[in-house]
Regions:
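N-terminal signal peptide c-region/cleavage motif recognized by signal peptidases
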Residues: 18-19
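Bacterial N-terminal signal peptides that target proteins for export
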Residues: 1-10
């Protein structure tokens, strides 16, 4: 079943982007320009409507997850030569944000960012996407009503609706921020044939982050040194890129894109020092993404290390803390 049947009921869609074919199972995003003025769909025929600068195509659709959550799929295609961002944009830029309005009893989770490109762009560190990317926002029922929470019979209100308001920065020589808006009846119709595995699966040709525990990766933080070890899964290249954690600063030279690891047989090891730990309520001490191989479709692992207890000399991380429930690798 596709979303084409409900496209006519979408109250928030103002236009389809000029010259861009919109998939039949997707809701095209209404566009508000950088100045905050909504584009007027009646001002010109389809072929003459202006595109959002820096974004060639955008749409929203629904998929289902293997853990029985629904997933809002935000599909963004940058204009050739432009790019959009990962959760840590690198030296400049901003990650996109997705604000969902949902009926009572439903809650949106944290956005899942697929594996990004990690490279130098115009002399700066860049983490993001220069080709089409699909950001995933899981949505779960939290009130426990009904034996089948996905049944349309459990709809709390005949007039219930969903709405998403996304802000997406796209950059080339300069940057623009576009607000993309879409919505429709609740519950939505999910795209047929989707069974997305958020933990270590793939979507849209890009790997989705696995947890350290599921990937068999162990990490420790002792004094100011982070050590990450795990199975290499047949690759000869392993790198670590930092997440956007306030206060966390790696002890690497300016302009370093990623920390390179070493591969020995079927295992890898990444080691680096920290200048400072992550700070703020609920923030981990260290977080980032382990990239196995070089292709966007190859595995990646999301790694977090909680704040350890300070040692007797006041040095942070004096008591090493594992990042997963796996036992430390044997020496």
């Amino acid at each position: 079943m596709t979303l084409s049947a409900v496209a006519s009921a979408v109250a928030f869609v103002a236009l389809a982007l000029s010259g861009a074919a919109v998939p039949q199972d997707a809701v095209p995003a209404a566009v508000q320009q950088d100045e905050g003025q909504a584009a007027d769909p009646s001002a010109a025929p389809d072929a003459a409507r202006p595109r959002t600068e820096g974004i060639d195509r955008s749409s929203f659709r629904w998929a289902q997850s293997s853990d029985q959550s629904w997933i809002l799929v935000a599909s963004i295609t940058p204009t050739p030569g432009w790019h959009v961002y990962w959760e840590n944009p690198g030296d400049s830029g901003n990650a996109p944000s997705f604000e969902l309005t949902l009926p009572a009893g439903w809650r949106a989770g944290r956005t899942v960012f697929p594996r990004p490109e990690a490279r130098t762009l115009d002399g700066s560190v860049f983490y993001g996407y220069s080709r089409s990317v699909e950001y995933l926002v899981p949505v779960k029922r939290v009130d426990g009503v009904g034996d089948d929470p996905w049944s349309r019979d459990n709809k709390p209100d005949a007039n219930a609706a969903w709405k998403v308001r996304a802000k997406v920065m796209a950059c080339k020589e300069r940057c623009t921020v576009s607000t993309l808006v879409a919505g429709g009846d609740w519950p939505p119709l999910a795209e047929a044939g989707t069974d997305v595995r958020l933990n270590g699966g793939s979507f849209g040709g890009r790997a989705l982050p696995a947890t350290a525990a599921s990937a068999g990766i162990f990490a420790s933080l002792e004094n100011n040194t982070v050590r990450i070890e795990g199975p290499s899964r047949g690759t000869s290249t392993v790198r670590f890129i930092p997440a956007a954690i306030p206060g966390m600063q790696l002890g690497v030279p300016d302009g370093t894109v990623a920390v390179d690891g070493t591969v020995n047989g079927d295992r890898f090891r990444v080691e680096f020092t920290l200048q400072s730990l992550g700070q703020g309520p609920g923030e981990p001490a260290v977080a980032g993404l382990v990239l196995l191989g070089n292709d966007p479709s190859e595995p990646c692992v999301w790694l977090t290390i909680p704040h350890p207890l300070a040692g007797p000399d006041g040095a942070f991380g004096a008591n090493g803390v594992g990042a997963s429930d796996q036992a430390p690798p044997s020496k």
